[in-house]
Amino acid sequence: MEGLAGYVYKAASEGRVLTLAALLLNRSESDIKYLLGYVSQHGGQRSTPLIIAARNGHTKVVRLLLEHYRVQTQQTGTVRFDGFVIDGATALWCAAGAGHFEVVKLLVSHGANVNHTTVTNSTPLRAACFDGRLDIVKYLVENNANISIANKYDNTCLMIAAYKGHTDVVRYLLEQHADPNAKAHCGATALHFAAEAGHLEIVRELVKWKAAMMVNGHGMTPLKVAAESCKADVVELLLAHAGCNRRSRIEALELLGASFANDRENYDIMKTYHYLYLAMLERYRDSENIIEKEVLPPIEAYGNRTECRTPQELESIRQDRDALHMEGLIVRERILGSDNIDVSHPIIYRGAVYADNMEFEQCIKLWLHALHLRQKGNRNTHKDLLRFAQVFSQMIHLNEPVKAKDIESVLRCSVLEIEQGMSRIKATQDDDIHTAVDNYECNIFTFLYLVCISTKTQCSEEDQSRINKQIYNLIHLDPRTRDGSTLLHHAVNSSTPVDDFHTNDVCSFPNALVTKLLLDCGADVNAVDNEGNSPLHLIVQYHRPISDFLTLHSIIISLVEAGAHTDMTNKQKKTPLDKSTTGVSEILLKTQMKLSLKCLAARAVRIYNISYQNQIPRTLEEFVKFH
């Protein structure tokens, strides 16, 4: 029956109404109920014949299922739309979201619930608003769809239509008394979403319907959001209509100009100067009431520059692009605040431009500043940390000097991020745990790249001591990847992933220098992963014993000299010697094996299954256990 259900689903999916009717012909009522209620799984989607037929716009199939077989319209499934996975979607939601008006009408006429919500509280009306189908939106509203139902983030139908740029839908919803000042969880209104996306006509429409200049959860008004997003026409419209005071006007013009200076998509240095100058004129418009700037203290990353305070100072840097770039970054940080989520992106962009021009020192200063801002705001920084490993690797590959103090700074931030990552994993819900673990593991690997880079950098004794302190700090936290591997396991493992953007020009594993450095900083040489393997178990399986003999030799010697037990068994009762995959590693291991009487005795106890628990000191029990 399951095989037949697959054929039924396929026929419904492809709109083959005659085939579907033939498959169901002369079937018992219970069989038909089973076949038409069967949930098929394809490409991450889970749906019934009715849902997939509605999703694909097969009107005749939907009519057959509803009128002849009385299929329940409230069946739910999991579907993909525009890259999003929608759980709990009905056939009506799918038809509305995919723009199949005839199917929508069929379903509604057969009693489909127009206000049924998905797991995230999305309605069919919201799906139609997302797609911009005014005809479907009108039909649903005329059939009692509630325009005020928001999704689980309190994001309304008006907000999604405003963000997606569907002017006619926005106008209709406002005419139906949708609240233009409703707030989402993040504090944003429809005006915020339209302003950020630069939809001028929608902004004009919302203002006409008395949308207020409200502040969102990040302290941003729609005017500020438009300025930060380089939407000059929206800024000028809001300045003309919003009745904002002089300070707000100045701030918006400054933020707009500053944003044009360091935006990858909207870079325009002429507009930077133009809007900064307009803001400066506004400050000095009334000689009796000049609005002075409250400037930030000088920041090293910005070349210790002080922001221009007079029209003359601004005029003096008009032809100096670099100065205008820095002016833009300073202005943004002053207006938005250092804890604003959007402050760091242009800093990173400007740093990347410096790196592309081989101006690595300035790049690193900016990226370190951005990293500190993001960590201060408790943001995920795995991409930022990896970016440093990439640029340091690029520098080494090009024989450019890398400063040990910069490596140490990034290592320190990595330790903090990995520690926070451990806490995030403990506090994370099951749905997001995969992403949290991915980011955490990425940071562990980045830390190893940075350690590897440090071994290829000129360091004074003091610098090396500082680097070692950060390595010690992380070893002390004992971070593990999914398979229970420690830093030392990954340092000796050829399967350790290496980022392929510059990093793999400099870093590779197994790595003898990284292994030695980790051991010098206190790494546990006999730590085991989830399978009971010690680092020694892993290195003896290295598949390049001849071409990379020195690495294999150095690591085995380092591990044994640090106290690695050559007779230690994993969960399969295999010693490193048993796990050796080549004659070379076997010979190297045998030449290093100096079994103590204590080890021989422990092995004998294990081999002959002699009872030892609660008969010897507890510290010895652990020792016997891993032999």
Curated annotation (Swiss-Prot):
Gene Ontology CC entries for this record: Cul2-RING ubiquitin ligase complex; cytoplasm; nucleus; ubiquitin ligase complex
GO process terms (BP): apoptotic process; proteasome-mediated ubiquitin-dependent protein catabolic process; protein ubiquitination; regulation of DNA damage checkpoint; ubiquitin-dependent protein catabolic process via the C-end degron rule pathway
ANK repeat start-end pairs: 45-74, 87-116, 120-149, 153-182, 186-215, 218-248, 483-527, 531-568
PROSITE patterns (alphabetical): ANK_REP_REGION, ANK_REPEAT
Gene3D superfamilies xrefs: Ankyrin repeat-containing domain (1.25.40.20)
Subcellular location(s) of the protein: Cytoplasm; Nucleus
Protein role: Substrate-recognition component of a Cul2-RING (CRL2) E3 ubiquitin-protein ligase complex of the DesCEND (destruction via C-end degrons) pathway, which recognizes a C-degron located at the extreme C terminus of target proteins, leading to their ubiquitination and degradation. The C-degron recognized by the DesCEND pathway is usually a motif of less than ten residues and can be present in full-length proteins, truncated proteins or proteolytically cleaved forms.
GO molecular function annotations of the record: ubiquitin-like ligase-substrate adaptor activity
Family: Belongs to the fem-1 family.
Identification of the protein by name: Protein fem-1 homolog B
